[in-house]
């Protein structure tokens, strides 16, 4: 699809029912540079997605032995290659490997498939049991009801469909059964973790629901016996509950989490929202991105006539509209707290009892790349207007500024390592920035930085989160975005051929 900018200027004023209102000058800024050299075989090679995938393959040879040290592929919170680490069946590995799977489907390069399969085969035994480490330990998932441990299950279905090896389906069926055991709050939402009772986090929608929807499609397609209706309805119920309880209608965006506890207490958090506060008060970009992608990927599997499908498509449109609105026009990226700009910081750090001023906000790479993937895929699938290709292109240009490629070396800058639910704006932006692969220890506690931190967000000297290079969420997000934005030569949005584009 080619966008003619003069024609676009003419039709935009007549668009009805969209919040994508674009001034002529803004259109020119967004659409003037198609940046087709990456997607259409231009001079600026190598492509970003392939470079990141090759970097992982070459840096971590993915040896079988759990004592492989720096050669292990375990990107769990970016602890390698600085220290030995076991392989984890965990989203921090599943996300970059799923991004690599997308690059495999885009390029047909078998080494990516072999790498992913080898990683999975060190964790799946002959009976389809999932092992925690790569040395055949019988220890199961660290807790099978933690949704973060379920995300790699999407790869199990992909590998089964590619190889027909029943081990992968057996392992997937075990995770499918585990989903039935996740505890629920009184309203019916899955607990994010047992340590966070009654809390549904947006993150969890991406971690488990696309897998369950894909598994339900296996039922529906008669590939395996089972109840597709229950699987699909479970998925849409979780998405709708998040929509019901975290949606901010003014901003068309979603808060990080909500709490269904009868006593209103947010348990397990270092800096929780106020007791009785049903939702968090912060619009964290990556949690919104997880929700956005979770819904988009679920739509791949959900039947066209499912009664909840239109509501899910509406969620995708709402978020897409907000992404246009809150995109940083200077960089093309999105901020860590998506709706806050540095010229309009919240008073008192976003909390009435805050003792320090609000800290600056900053662009976050992984969320930005996930948004690009979601926008581009939604355009391709027809969920949103083709005009959003402009937003996706600007976002992709911004993401590429955060990817440093020097020969075989790759650095993806500016990704937050992890983010618990917090009660204040400051708790989401009070970051320790380092340009290395390791997380490193938290700053030592001081009198003004207690352990655990105080109920309100801590003073500026107490960093609550880390921003690093080559964090796994960032590596995976960039490959996902590249799988949509870096097509084979001559292809445009909506004209992908030869590979499975789900």
Where are the regions a protein language model picked out?
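Bacterial N-terminal signal peptides that target proteins for export
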Residues: 2-15
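Bacterial N-terminal signal peptides
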Residues: 14-23
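Boundary of Sec targeting at the N-terminus
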Residues: 30-32
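CBM-like carbohydrate-recognition segments
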Residues: 41-94, 106-147, 151-153, 159-162, ...
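Alpha-helical scaffold segments in carbohydrate-active enzymes
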Residues: 55, 102, 122, 174-181, ...
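Extended ligand-binding groove/face enriched in aromatic
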Residues: 125-271
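Inter-helical turn/loop segments and adjacent helix faces that build the functional surface
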Residues: 215-233, 298-310, 378-386
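Oxyanion-binding "anion nests"
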Residues: 290-341
